[in-house]
């Protein structure tokens, strides 16, 4: 895609469509905009089908690998030259937690025989296996629960996914996996959150523990 040079200005009245080749904004925006224009111009394309397909395309590579314990093996990481030196494996928890928090409400919908229903069912089944691997110390995809302060943030996204789809994503887990999650969430209290939005991450985890009937820290919720 075209990347706008620093200092270059947009042309007044410039219009973007699927055939645009003129300079417009930065490359990432141009590519995204053109893709969306193609979608808008496609005949008889439903919004829901389009967005569900995108959600599936984003989720499948993560969950299909993690369900087999192969996410960390197959997901290559690249870091900035200014990387702060923290353990790079935080990226795997970030990937899984934020993905699941995002698609959890979608996965709460009941199964059906539509194309969307089949996608949801497939992702949910892979997600349940991925959840188990995430807290199994013997799994290659055991996440970085015991190191780095960042795990409080991304652990909260995992907890949020359970809150958003409690019956579909938490209840089906086996008792060993549930016990492991409760232990991992509780040990995150070792991290003292700064007085920022990190307070919300702590409260999300404690709120989930309360819902699951486990011991929770009321102070961190209030």
What are these regions (language model features)?
Residues 43-129:
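Extreme N-terminal leader/anchor segments
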Residues 13-20, 83-93, 145-149, 193:
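Short, solvent-exposed segments of well-ordered alpha helices
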Residues 92, 103-106, 120-222:
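Aromatic-lined, polymer-binding surfaces characteristic
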Residues 38-41, 108, 211:
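Generic secondary-structure signature for well-ordered alpha-helical cores
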Residues 5-8, 95, 147:
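Generic structural "secondary-structure junction" signal
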Residues 41, 63-74, 111, 139, ...:
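Residue-level signal for secondary-structure boundary elements
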Residues 23-34, 97, 101, 156, ...:
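A structural signal for well-ordered alpha-helical segments within the folded catalytic domains
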Residues 1-43, 64-84:
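CBM-like carbohydrate-recognition segments
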């Amino acid at each position: 895609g075209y990347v706008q040079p620093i200092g270059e200005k947009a042309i007044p009245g410039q219009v973007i469509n699927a055939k645009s080749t003129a300079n417009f904004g930065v490359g990432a925006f141009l590519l995204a905009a053109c893709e969306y224009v193609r979608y808008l111009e496609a005949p008889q394309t439903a919004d829901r089908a389009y967005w569900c397909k995108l959600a599936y395309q984003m989720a499948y590579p993560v969950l299909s690998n993690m369900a087999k314990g192969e996410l960390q093996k197959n997901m290559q990481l690249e870091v900035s030259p200014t990387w702060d030196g923290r353990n790079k494996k935080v990226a795997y928890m970030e990937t899984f937690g934020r993905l699941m928090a995002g698609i959890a409400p979608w996965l709460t919908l009941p199964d059906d025989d539509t194309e969307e229903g089949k996608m949801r069912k497939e992702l949910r089944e892979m997600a349940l296996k991925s959840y188990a691997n995430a807290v199994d110390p013997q799994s290659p995809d055991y996440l970085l629960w015991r190191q780095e302060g960042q795990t409080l943030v991304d652990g909260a996204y995992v907890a949020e996914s359970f809150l958003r789809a409690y019956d579909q994503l938490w209840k089906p887990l086996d008792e060993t996996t549930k016990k492991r999650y409760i232990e991992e969430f509780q040990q995150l209290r070792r991290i003292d959150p700064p007085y920022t939005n990190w307070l919300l991450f702590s409260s999300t985890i404690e709120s989930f523990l309360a819902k699951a009937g486990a011991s929770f820290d009321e102070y961190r919720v209030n």
